[in-house]
Amino acid sequence: GINVEDMRYRCGSMLARRDAGTVQPDIVAGVPDSGIAHAIGYANESGIPFSRPFIKYTPTWPRSFMPTMQSQRNLIAKMKLIPVHELIQGRSLLLIDDSIVRGTQLRETTEFLYQSGAREVHVRPACPPLLYGCKYLNFSRSTSVMDLITRRVIKEMTGTEEPADLAKYADPESGEYNAMIEYIGKKLNFTSLRYHRLDDMIQSVGIDKCKLCTYCWDGQE
C-alpha cells in the first residue's frame, strides 16, 4: 500500500518545486492538523523553515466542516486556533491546507493571521481546485455544486453556472484556469494562491491515474 503521511510529504515537496524562485516567505506553516504534513514536505524541499504560528485547541469542539450552518463552521474553526504572535508579527507566511472547498474558513484564517500581524499570507492548497461535487460519497455537508468556491467564481466571471468550456478550468495550462485562480486569490485576500496540480498529485500518490478517482477535480468518471 501507499503510506499516506509519506504521500503528504511528497505533495508538499511538489508544491515547493512549482514555487521555486517565485516566492520568498519567512516561514512555511500548515493549517492544523490537515496541512501540517504537506507543510513539512514543502519546508524540507524548499529549505524555508517550518513553523507553527497557531496552536490547535480541540477539547469540546467538533470537526469544523460538520455543522450545517456556515456561521457555526466559521466559529468552530476560529475558536480552535490560538495565535503565536511572536511567529506571526511582521512575517511573510506560506500557508498550506489540504484543500479549499467553500473558501470561507481559509479566508477567516487568513484574516486571523493579518490581524495577528502577518505581513503576507501565501496560500498553497495541497489538492487541485474542486470543480465537481462528489457523486460517490456523502462525506461533505455541501448540497450544491455552487457551494464550491471555484464554481461561484466561475459564475461571477462568466455569468453562468455551467459554462460549455468548464473542462478548461481544470487545466492548469489554460487561461481560464489561471484567471479563476487569480480571482479566487483576490476574493479571499491571499497575497498569492497556487493549487497543487492534478498531475503532480497523482505523481505524489504513486498510483496510476486509471486506478484513482479524480472526478471532483476533472469530471472524469
Task: Map each language-model feature to its residues.
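PRPP-associated nucleotide enzymes
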Residues: G1-E221
